[in-house]
Amino acid sequence: MDPAPELGITDISLSAYLRLLRGNVNFRRLWGAQVVSEIGDWFYTLAIYNLLLQLTGRAGSVALALVLQVLPQTLVGPAAGVINDRLRRKHVMIVADLGRMLIVFSMLFVRSKGVVWMVYPLLIAETLLAAFFEPARNSVIPNIVEKEDVVLANTLSSTTWSLNLMIGAALGGAVAALLGRDAVFILNALSFLASAFFILRMRFVEPHAEGARPLHVRDLVDFSPIVDGIRYVRSQVRLRYAIFVKAGNLIIGPGWVLFTVMGQNEFAVRWHGLDPARGAFLGMSILLGARGVGALLGPLLTAPWAGQWVRRLEIAIFWGYLGAAAGYTLLGVSSHLWQASLCVMLAHFGSAIVWVFSTTLLQRYSDDSFRGRVFSADLGIFMLSIAASGALAGIFIDRGVSVHTVAFATGVAMLLPALVWFWALRFWRQEA
């Protein structure tokens, strides 16, 4: 494969975003589904973690919730990839949305410490459905936009994700403070219904499903498509490395635990008359909002430079790793909420670059007939990384290690994937 093929994309700008949304009705509907469901998700995630920390008082409960939100995606990823490469991905997304709506409504039954156990199986069920939805969404983008607009669409999706994080964190804190957690759960459930409606209205051709034989239950235990997918990935040198890039984002798992504990104990908002529990929720919201600002600016500012060439995308990923490392290292020595927020912004500025550009590389390198399996593997490996790093963060905090030390160590650990990726870039240059 050409080590630095030109992508030939259009310029990335606000006018280009507007052109894509106005001129491509299918992408506009997929984007609308993303907006409503992700804002609801950020409401929901804050509420779940706040609920667990309030009822149990243990960082480990938050870490366990994080593991259950991500680890099942690793286990079900191969089956999800096969299904997404055999069935219409539009139908997969609709079923996943409707199932998640019912699951989130069920969270309303968690009213006391005695039934807090219900959170965990519900999180597992929701995560299993998400494992089918996300690879399907990533896989359909090349089917609904022109080749030269793929990077533009990915950048817009990332920018939207970041805006949704900012909006969801801000509104989630406000809604929870004013109306309570139940309102947050209801709004998130309805957001999945709205997302399913948007996707239902999409009309596009799915080449992988044309003429495909019917899917049977036995196909889910037939590992030959998975083996074929592994062989395909191994045969593509750059794809073989790119599929592990997101897993190197080691700040994501610990970040969720750190934001929850820091928001509760270190940086809770203490306005006059504000209930302490709701002040803790607002502290979490501010840190999460800072993450959204950084994740928004990262791809937005670097995509116009990097988007034209694969080589630049690869170099930007290396610098993204370093930015994430610097941000969390500095977070470990922050003593005020505003300082912590700036550090989080820097870290996720870099982390978002890694996410967006690795997604573009995977779409660029993979054939449509394998793309579902490629993105399922990508998501599964990434989720395994989140689960492991988040669990370790929770264990260390519960054993008395300060949150600042955990943050600092997380930043230092980010140097490892940066060095591995740097070595890979040098190796490819020598092989070219």
Where do the protein language model's features map onto the residues?
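Helix-loop junctions on the cytosolic side of multi-pass membrane transporters
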Residues: S139, N143, F185-V217, F422-A432
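Residue-level signature of transmembrane alpha-helical entry/exit and packing/kink sites
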Residues: N26, W42, V115, V119, ...
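C-terminal transmembrane bundle of multi-pass solute transporters/carriers
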Residues: D2, L75-P78, R86, V92, ...
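MFS-fold secondary transporters
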Residues: Y44, L53, S106-V110, E126, ...
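Transmembrane alpha-helix termini and helix-breaking/packing motifs in multi-pass membrane transporters
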Residues: L46-T56, M107-K113, I167-L187, V261-R270, ...
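Substrate-agnostic recognition of the 12-TM MFS/MFS-like secondary transporter fold
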Residues: R28-L46, L66-N84, R88-I103, M118-A177, ...
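Small-residue hotspots at the loop-to-helix junctions and early N-terminal turns
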Residues: Y44-A47, L51, T56-A63, T155, ...
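Juxtamembrane intracellular "pre-TM" segments in multi-pass secondary transporters
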Residues: D2-R28, V205-F244
